Amino acid sequence: EEIVTKYGKPGEKQHMRCPVHLSIGQEAAAVGACTHLTRNDRIFSTHRCHAHYLAKGGDVRRMVLELHGKLGGCLDGRGGSMHLMDDSVGAVASVPIVSSSIPLAVGSALADKLDANQNVSFAFFGDASMEEGVFHESANFAAVQQLVGGHFI
């Protein structure tokens, strides 16, 4: 997160074209969650996705370019801070809407089950997500379908 914070100091000209939601102090959780995931495993994140993206193998240079809205960013500057994605490393989606990463991860886990592979789909979300119906619906569906996946709050 030091890369990001050096561009957002109060009173200085802002270099980023988009809101940046940091997760300072939470990087170790992302690393721990992603350590044993493979490139074929997929993560679905929130608006605080920087650590998840990097822990899954995302490129630092492409992340910084994305934060600045530049070509060469992980989405060629179109996604910004809250939408870091790189399918080649399994960082499939970063969704800023509360709880929205959860059903995507469950759908991905269902696709893996139907394809009979051993991939894992992993959703990161905040505690407020558990107040949303989609959290409970997704958890119920995943249990009934016996899907392989993980959730990290």
Regions found by a protein language model. Give the residues of each.
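Cofactor-binding active-site loop characterized by glycine-rich and histidine/acidic residues
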Residues: 2-5, 9-145
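A short, conserved beta-to-alpha structural element at the edge of catalytic cores
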Residues: 145-153
